[in-house]
Each structure stands twice: as C-alpha cells, then as structure tokens.
C-alpha cells in the first residue's frame, strides 16, 4: 500500500512544487492548471481510489492513516497553501484564512474521487456527469470567491471561464 501511495501520489509532490515555483502566469491560471493536471494524473486514474479507501478505512488503521497524513495530506495542503499565498501576495486573491482556504480548493477534488469510486457507478443511465465540466464549473466558482473584488462602483473584470 505504501509503495503504491508513494509512486502514484506522494512521489509527485516534488514535481508539483517545481511546477508551482516555475509557473509563468497568474495565480488563477496556476489554479486552473493544477486542477486540470490533478485530474489527468490522479483523479482520472485508479490512484483516485486510494482516497476513497482512506475515507472509509482510516479509522480502522491508525498507522496507515498517519502515513497517509504525512505523505499525502500535509504536503498537499502545503502546496495549495503556497498557491493561495502566492495569489494573496500578488494582489490577485483576497486575504483569507489559508487553513480553510485549502479546504475550499480540495473539496471539489475530494468530491470527484468519491463520486468516481462510489456514487458515479450508481448514476442513472441518462444522467450525464462530466468530470471536466464539473472542474471548469468549480474553478469558475472558486475564482469568483478568491479573487480580489473591485471597489464599490468599479466595473468588474470579465469572467475567466477556462
């Protein structure tokens, strides 16, 4: 189990940190890129089932839960926190509680992993749920909450639909 987690998720944090450090563009563009890359590299793969497994079994295996926390949860939250901090420092994102801001970014990813590995297969045949469209909708929603708001009376910037 540990080897699978390290190979498929935890082992990618060095790569993701480098991508964040070298990214040229706005923090909104970084966020869009991160969601898209996460979906391609984790969410759309069998590795997404690891998170569902941890959701359902972590309380039964404290040592595995601690391992997952150290190898995946803490580095993931730190990476998201750095991205949000970058946006705040550049004046692109409004000031926020970064501890809770990370959960705002994580929640759509967690939902997709749970959906694909549990409720998705139970969907009605005519129900269309496209993960990519869900991600685009969530990005738009999150960015409208994170971005600096124009001063009263100012014209708002155009929507950035990815």
Question: Each predicted region: which residue ranges?
Answer:
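Amphipathic alpha-helical packing segments from all-alpha helical-bundle domains
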Residues: 29, 40-49, 53-55, 63-89, ...
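Amphipathic alpha-helical segments enriched in hydrophobic/aromatic and basic residues
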Residues: 1-8, 65, 69
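C-terminal peripheral helix-coil segments that are non-catalytic and often amphipathic
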Residues: 29, 33, 37, 74, ...
């Amino acid at each position: 189990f540990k080897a699978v987690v390290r190979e498929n998720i935890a082992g990618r944090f060095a790569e993701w940190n480098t991508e964040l450090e070298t990214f040229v563009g706005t923090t909104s563009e970084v966020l869009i890129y991160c969601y898209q890359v996460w979906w391609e590299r984790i969410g759309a793969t069998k590795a997404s089932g690891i998170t569902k497994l941890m959701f359902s079994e972590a309380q039964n295996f404290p040592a595995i839960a601690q391992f997952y926390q150290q190898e995946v949860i803490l580095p993931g939250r730190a990476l998201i926190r750095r991205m949000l901090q970058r946006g705040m420092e550049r004046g692109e994102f409004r000031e926020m509680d970064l501890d809770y801001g990370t959960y705002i970014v994580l929640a759509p990813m967690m939902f997709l992993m749970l959906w694909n590995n549990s409720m998705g297969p139970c969907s009605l045949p005519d129900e269309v749920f496209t993960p990519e469209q869900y991600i685009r909708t969530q990005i738009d929603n999150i960015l409208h909450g994170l971005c600096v708001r124009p001063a009263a009376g100012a014209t708002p910037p155009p929507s950035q639909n990815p």
